[in-house]
């Protein structure tokens, strides 16, 4: 059974790629067509690869794998934090700090510092310090929480990393490759499939597309750990509306209606 329908993918705008002039030729097998200078992703391929990614992630979660979600672009940051938290995973949704994985020992000292200041705050010690010192520590705490809050409970390197926007997160990709940590990623038409162990051809710029794909991967982790999905959890967006249409014609019509491509799609 497919974890997502073609109408759901279409409604979320998963099919909108980048300008054809910016494509990576390695993505040719996953491109359906070009219209008005924009590449259109083959949603049949997306559904197939999402099914494979779902099973890969679910089976990993069953084995006790710990996952790290990475997505620092504005459109992805909130989704990454929400979905990672929902399925009990770690996340980086601000700036990727150099050496976050390859220099884990040093990053761990900064996490320890974050926890130290948090303890000072919860114990009331900060309130008893001189105002200037307390203000300095609160600023330090805010900065550490911003960049490391999503991984402060991570005791060791993750077993797999889920990445939104391979090109933007190039440093994270290279660190994973160096450490042989499996990469699961959304691949837009300007990406390189050779840099991912598991990938899903998808628009990686539109909020609804990111929400749909990342949400399904979070579902897979949750299902792998708990044996079933929690039906109380509902997506923020409604992707379930049934549409009676010829998908091929509709995809092309959507693109022809766009003068500059999907308004949510980056250049």
Curated annotation (Swiss-Prot):
SUPFAM superfamilies: Ribosomal protein S2. It comes from the Bacteria. One of its GO terms (biological process) is translation. Keywords: Ribonucleoprotein, Ribosomal protein. Residues 247-267 are annotated as: Disordered. The keyword Metal-binding does not apply. InterPro entries: Ribosomal_uS2, Ribosomal_uS2_bac/mit/plastid, Ribosomal_uS2_CS, Ribosomal_uS2_flav_dom_sf. CDD domains: RPS2. Pfam families: Ribosomal_S2 (PF00318). One of its GO terms (cellular component) is cytosolic small ribosomal subunit. The keyword Transferase does not apply. GO terms for molecular function: structural constituent of ribosome. Gene3D superfamilies: Glucose-6-phosphate isomerase like protein, domain 1, Helix hairpin bin. HAMAP family: Ribosomal_uS2_B. NCBIfam families: rpsB_bact. Belongs to the universal ribosomal protein uS2 family. PANTHER family: 30S RIBOSOMAL PROTEIN S2 PROKARYOTIC AND ORGANELLAR (PTHR12534), SMALL RIBOSOMAL SUBUNIT PROTEIN US2M (PTHR12534:SF0). This is Small ribosomal subunit protein uS2. It comes from Synechococcus sp. (strain JA-3-3Ab). The gene is rpsB.
């Amino acid at each position: 059974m497919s974890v997502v329908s073609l109408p759901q993918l279409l409604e979320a705008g998963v099919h909108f790629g980048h300008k054809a002039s910016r494509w990576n030729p390695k993505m040719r097998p996953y491109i359906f067509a070009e219209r008005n200078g924009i590449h259109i992703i083959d949603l049949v391929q997306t559904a197939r690869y999402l099914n494979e990614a779902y099973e890969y992630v679910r089976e990993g979660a069953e084995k006790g794998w710990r996952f790290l979600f990475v997505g620092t672009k504005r459109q992805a940051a909130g989704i990454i934090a929400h979905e990672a938290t929902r399925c009990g995973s770690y996340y980086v949704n601000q700036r990727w700090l150099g050496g976050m994985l390859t220099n884990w020992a040093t990053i761990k000292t900064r996490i320890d510092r974050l926890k130290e200041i948090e303890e000072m705050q919860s114990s009331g010690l900060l309130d008893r310090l001189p105002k200037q010192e307390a203000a300095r520590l609160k600023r330090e705490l805010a900065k550490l929480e911003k960049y490391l809050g999503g991984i402060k409970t991570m005791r060791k390197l993750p077993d797999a990393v889920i990445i939104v926007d391979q090109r933007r997160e190039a440093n994270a990709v290279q660190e994973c490759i160096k450490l042989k940590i499996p990469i699961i990623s959304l691949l837009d038409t300007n990406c390189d499939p050779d840099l991912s162990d598991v990938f899903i051809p998808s628009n990686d710029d539109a909020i609804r597309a990111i929400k749909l794909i990342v949400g399904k991967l979070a579902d897979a982790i949750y299902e792998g750990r708990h044996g079933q999905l929690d039906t109380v959890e509902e997506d923020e967006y409604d992707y379930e509306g049934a549409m009676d249409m010829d998908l091929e014609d509709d995809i092309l019509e959507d693109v022809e209606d766009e003068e500059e491509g999907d308004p949510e799609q980056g250049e």
